[in-house]
Amino acid sequence: MNVQIQSVKFDASKQFLDFSQKKMDRLDRFVDERAGDVEVVLRLDPDSEKGNKVVVISLHVPGSDIRVEERAFTFEEAIDNSMDIIKRQLEKAKAKFEK
């Protein structure tokens, strides 16, 4: 699975990019070999009470695309929360596809 990480209007540290890559690599357990690319967009939102760090993850799978947008006070927290949501959506998509 090809992972593309993009930070908007700031430079993400190598340590954080490695953290993000590791998290996205874990998705391999939940998707089959037909899954496409994963796009991760990191951006800062100055006007948010829930946190100013925004992570948008798009996963291209056969039949549909899964997109999650999560806000938090840290990018790590936003990615962790997004991963939980993506796992649930993948399970739903698998159940739907197997019917």
Give the positions of each predicted feature.
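N-terminal, polar/charged subdomain of small-to-medium soluble alpha/beta proteins
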Residues: 1-99
